[in-house]
Amino acid sequence: MEALRNCSVEIQAGEFVAIVGPSGCGKSTLLNMIAGFDTVSTGDIHVDDSLLAAASHPPRPGPDRVVVFQNGALFPWKTVLENVMYGPLRQKILSRSQAKEKALDLLRNCGRLDAVAESYPAQLSSGMQRRVEIVRALMNDPRVLLLDEPFRAMDTVSKTTMHQHLLEMYRLCQKTIVFITHDLEEAIYLADKVVVMTTRPGMIKKIISVRLPRPRVPEMLSSREYLEMKREAAEGIHEEAKKAFERGEREQA
C-alpha cells in the first residue's frame, strides 16, 4: 500500500515544523522515514549534505535524529538522572562525570527538573515524564528532534503547560524540530510553519507560514492572525476528511 506520494518539503536548520493531516495520511510514516526506521521506496531524504534515505540506500537511524514517541519510553528502573545520561554513556561519547554534569544542566534549564533528578518515572506526573523524555532526547545533541504526537493523551491544562515548556526548551536549544500532531491549535501555536497533508496516499496539500512572533504566549490564540491561519488549515483538513469519507475509508490511528 502506498503511504506517501510526491512529498517534498524543505526544512531550515533550527526551524520548528508541524505536520498535520487526517488520520492514516502518513504523518508518522514520514517521521519514521526521517528517523531511519522505515524504508524509502522512491525519492530521498537529506540532512544538510548527508543522504539519510533513498530507494537504493538502506534506512540508517542515527544519533543526529532522535524520536520522542506518543507512548512513554523512560526506563522505569532508572532514576530521572540515569535515564537522561543513558544515551551518551551507552554510546561512550561522554564520561560518567561529563554526562552527569550535562544532564543536570539540561534538567535545570528545562523547568527546574533537576529537583526530581533522583526520582523514578513512576513518581512523576505524565507531563513531567514527557519533559524528561524530551530532555533525554536533547542530551544526545541531535540535529533534528522528531516528536510524534507527544502530548496526545494529555488533558487541556496539562497540554497547555507542556506547550510552554517545549517552547522554552526550543528557545534554549534551537534544534530543528519536526512535530506530528492532529491538533491544529497546537501546530500553529508551536511551529514556524505547518505542513498540511492530504488523505492517503499522503501528499502535501499546503504549507502555512506561521505569522506569529516569538516568544509565543497563550494570548496569541485569540489574535486575528492566529484565527485566520487556523481557518486556512482547518479548511484543508476538512476537505481531505470529506474525500476519505466519500471513499469509505476507515479512520486509522
Language-model regions, residue ranges each:
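ABC ATPase NBD coupling module
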Residues: 51-69, 90, 96-97, 219-222
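Helix-to-loop junction immediately C-terminal to a conserved catalytic motif
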Residues: 35
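Conserved signature/switch motifs of ABC ATPase nucleotide-binding domains
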Residues: 122, 140
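Catalytic Walker B motif of ABC-type/P-loop ATPase nucleotide-binding domains
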Residues: 145-148
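Hydrophobic anchor residue at the start of the ABC signature
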Residues: 134
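Short helical segment in ABC ATPase nucleotide-binding domains corresponding to the A-loop/adjacent helical element
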Residues: 81-90, 100, 104, 209
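The feature captures the beta-strand-to-loop junction immediately N-terminal to the Walker
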Residues: 20-22
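Conserved ABC ATPase "signature" region
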Residues: 51, 96-115, 168
